[in-house]
Amino acid sequence: MKGISLYSVVPVRAEARESAEQNTQMLFGETRTILEQKPRWNRIKLDNDGQEGWIDAKMLAPMTEEEYTSYSKAYASAAMVSFPMVFAVSENNQQTIPLTAGTRLTNYQDGRFEILGVPFRIDASMVITQPIELNEQNLLQTVRFFLNIPYLWGGKNAMGMDCSGFTQIIMSLFGKRLLRNASEQATRGTARADITQVKAGDLVFFNHEGLNDGAANPQKITHVGIAIDSTRVIHCSGRVKVEKLDSTGIYNIEQGGYSHHLASIIDSESLL
């Protein structure tokens, strides 16, 4: 059975209870497949990145196969919210709904979009209809609005993001479709030989947090950021921020030491 989120952000949890860990979030307009049903909860698989988890059943709207097929075609080429947050207004009842960056807007044209037959208005200056060209200038212009968004485990919206939620949303604005977790994102694309080859938009992965705790495990990716150039990275650790990057890792000026150990670099041009 298929379904869709008509809420701004819906938590996807590790277990079927409100107090369970949040693994990820489902944004407005994202679809899912139901894998298992309980009286109050559905175990689902997200269509965009394959993440699985439990969602409160009342926070999802069912879709017929016909609706899903038609919507999926429109979703693939949909416009996208490019700013951290914007309000859309339903033309049916004039109620507003906050939408966050990365939210796709189907059937969009000139500040209006439609989802399952419901028309909405939105500020056109906060919407992109084509992916942004990935270069240093455009990357800096885009991410400056996301600075200081706080860290939230499982988050991928303007009120809280984790490291891989941040990279997934930002890179989607540049037409790159990433998996959800840092360890998964590290498995796609072509690796750079070393940091001297880094270009703006490359994904930078780290395998250890806190270099004083012993040797890093090269098999365990724990963190990801986006390179601005070979000396700077923007990432979410505590908050979204720009920090110094070198062949050792991320140097935290506030702490006076390295916070993350460099593991690998993925060429953004090799990502789809």
List where the protein language model places each region.
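Short, conserved secondary-structure segments in the cores of folded domains
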Residues: 22, 95, 191-194
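Catalytic cysteine-centered active-site loop
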Residues: 151-200
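Conserved "cap/hinge" positions at secondary-structure junctions
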Residues: 36, 109, 207-208, 237
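Aromatic- and glycine-rich peptidoglycan recognition patches
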Residues: 61-62, 128-129, 192, 218-223, ...
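Hydrophobic/aromatic-rich core segments of domains that either
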Residues: 196-213
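Boundary regions of SH3-family modules and the immediately adjacent low-complexity/disordered segments
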Residues: 1-7, 17, 24, 30-31, ...
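Hydrophobic beta-strand signal
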Residues: 33, 103-106, 205, 226, ...
